[in-house]
């Protein structure tokens, strides 16, 4: 075979091999719990302006996001609604050692539509007979759903209201059920209430386990350096200020 032909064949082989390799995604891919949906819009804007790094968020319940990571999803960073799930991924060897950090503490709230004929002054009022249905996030997948169950039990109305509960896949879907009138109210994250059009009442923090929320870098993620920069931004002064504006308590403010 002529040398020129061999060289051309080698070039084609190299090109085909390169084409078969999976390309790194152009954006930093962050899996984030849905309670962060509103806050992340502002976080994304500020981070991209300050760093020039594009971000793509994948929202879902913390349990579902963790399952995706366990199945090999090319995620760079998990920003969870609890600390237990990141610790679980850490125990499986799926995270960057030493990267698990608490970034905020969330609060649970009862939300209902502003135009509703119903009004709530406390969680116990969900037991009133005129409340036909209300929504919570699936407690098997969503930390805010588990907190809702704990709060209903602490309020002494669990047995009474359990038949009226509608389970949503995540806390954002629970809110959407209430917004669209499919249910009269929903137990959701305060962070989803503060800029909305509805009405809401805060649930006593002592009625459920603390909603300490942690982040962790995923080992083998295609954009680890960029993920480290986002984590530093979220834990820094500007990121913490944004979280506080959405009703989160930040580590320095948590007693």
Language model feature labels by segment:
Residues 4-5, 20, 202:
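N-terminal non-cleavable signal-anchor helices
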Residues 1-9:
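Bacterial N-terminal signal peptides that target proteins for export
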Residues 9-19:
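Bacterial N-terminal signal peptides
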Residues 23-52, 56-73, 80-83, 87-96, ...:
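Exported/periplasmic ABC-transporter solute-binding proteins
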């Amino acid at each position: 075979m002529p040398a020129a032909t061999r060289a051309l064949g080698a070039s084609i082989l190299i090109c085909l091999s390169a084409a078969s390799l999976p390309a790194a995604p152009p954006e930093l891919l962050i899996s984030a719990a849905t309670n962060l949906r509103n806050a992340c819009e502002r976080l994304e804007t500020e981070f991209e302006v300050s760093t020039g790094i594009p971000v793509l968020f994948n929202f879902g319940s913390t349990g579902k996001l963790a399952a995706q990571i366990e199945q090999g999803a090319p995620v760079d960073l998990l920003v969870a609604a609890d600390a237990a799930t990141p610790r679980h991924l850490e125990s499986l060897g799926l995270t960057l050692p030493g990267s698990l950090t608490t970034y905020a503490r969330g609060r649970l709230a009862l939300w209902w539509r502003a135009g509703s004929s119903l009004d709530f002054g406390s969680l116990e009022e969900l037991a009133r007979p005129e409340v036909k249905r209300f929504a919570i996030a699936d407690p098997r997948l969503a930390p805010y759903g588990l907190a809702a169950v704990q709060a209903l039990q602490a309020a002494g109305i669990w047995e009474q209201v359990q038949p009226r509960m509608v389970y949503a896949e995540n806390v954002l879907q629970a809110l959407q059920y209430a917004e669209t009138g499919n249910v009269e109210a929903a137990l959701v994250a305060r962070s989803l209430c503060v800029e909305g059009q509805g009405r809401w009442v805060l649930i006593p923090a002592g009625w459920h386990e603390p909603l300490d929320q942690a982040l962790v870098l995923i080992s083998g993620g295609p954009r680890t350096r960029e993920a480290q920069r986002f984590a530093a931004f979220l834990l820094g002064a500007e990121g913490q200020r944004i979280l506080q504006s959405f009703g989160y308590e930040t580590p320095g403010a948590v007693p």
